[in-house]
Amino acid sequence: MSRHEDRQKLALEFGATDNVTERGEEGAARIKELTGGLGAHSVVEAVGTQESMMQAIRSTRAGGHVGFVGVLHDVEIPGREFFYSHVHLHGGPAPVRRFLPELIDLIWNRKIDPGKVFDLTLPLEQVAEGYRAMDERRAIKTLLRP
């Protein structure tokens, strides 16, 4: 799900079958439409806002899973709606160190190319500009060089 063309292209390159640009109720309805009325088996929520979390839950089929990573920003999940959604919710900080050895191995053996997400390269002393570019959606991810 993205409204940004560069992210949409990258998602398709990584194997996405569809791009959904709608948000909120419209976004959840579009996911249901694409899945024959059922909803997604699994949803990753990586934004951390009220709207994005509720859209994730509402886009997931009964018995499906929502995984969230990162810090939630004042998200309140209505108990009754969540209970009757029959959705499993899992989350917490991303355990980077757990996966890092395997990921490094995949990178070194050229089985994955993480460079595709880096569309802006800056010197380390411009780290603030890198974060600003990502926040303003001028960059997907910023690669900082010493």
Regions found by a protein language model. Give the residues of each.
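Residues in the short beta-alpha loop(s) of Rossmann-like NAD(P)-binding domains
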Residues: 1-4, 72, 95
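Adenosine-nucleotide cofactor-binding segment
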Residues: 1-55
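Glycine- and other small-residue-rich loops at beta-strand/loop junctions that grip anionic moieties
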Residues: 20, 41-46, 69-71, 92, ...
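Short glycine-centered segments of the SAM/dcSAM-binding site in methyltransferase folds
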Residues: 42, 64-65, 88
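C-terminal hydrophobic helical "lid"/dimerization subdomain
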Residues: 54-58, 97-146
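Helix-to-beta-strand junctions that scaffold the AdoMet/dcAdoMet cofactor pocket
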Residues: 60-62
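Rossmann-fold NAD(P)-binding glycine/threonine-rich loop
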Residues: 70-86, 98-105
